[in-house]
């Protein structure tokens, strides 16, 4: 296979690995506070204002227990 055909087959996103983890902007359903949390949190994440649990660890991705407003890149 010649070089041009090889390079056409693969885009830059195929060659450079991208992280699978994301940061999330979430809103507390109790008090309406918005905060940014890590999608793969390894500890329980609580709201800074009211203390409600927003995310629980599951061994991989965190279980999000509130409303996700935005996924940050």
From Swiss-Prot:
PROSITE patterns, per database record: RIBOSOMAL_S27E
Keyword Cell cycle: no
Keywords: Metal-binding, Ribonucleoprotein, Ribosomal protein, Zinc, Zinc-finger
Note describing how the cofactor binds: Binds 1 zinc ion per subunit.
Domain of life (superkingdom): Archaea
Residues engaged in binding Zn(2+): 28, 31, 47, 50
Zinc finger C4-type: from-to: 28-50
GO MF term set: structural constituent of ribosome; zinc ion binding
InterPro entries the UniProt entry points to: Ribosomal_eS27 (IPR000592), Ribosomal_eS27_Zn-bd_dom_sf (IPR023407), Ribosomal_zn-bd (IPR011332)
SUPFAM superfamilies: Zn-binding ribosomal proteins
One Pfam family, short name: Ribosomal_S27e
Family matches, as NCBIfam families: PRK00415.1
Family membership noted in the UniProt record: Belongs to the eukaryotic ribosomal protein eS27 family.
PANTHER family registered for this protein in UniProt: 40S RIBOSOMAL PROTEIN S27
Cross-referenced HAMAP family: Ribosomal_eS27
Subunit structure: Part of the 30S ribosomal subunit.
Protein name: Small ribosomal subunit protein eS27
Organism expressing this protein natively: Methanopyrus kandleri (strain AV19 / DSM 6324 / JCM 9639 / NBRC 100938)
């Amino acid at each position: 296979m010649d070089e041009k055909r090889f390079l056409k087959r693969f885009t830059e996103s195929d060659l450079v690995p991208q992280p699978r983890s994301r940061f999330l902007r979430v809103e507390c359903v109790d008090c309406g506070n918005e905060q940014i949390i890590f999608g793969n949190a390894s500890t329980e994440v609580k709201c800074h204002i009211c203390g409600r649990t927003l995310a629980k660890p599951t061994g991989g991705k965190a279980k999000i227990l509130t409303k996700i407003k935005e996924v940050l890149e």
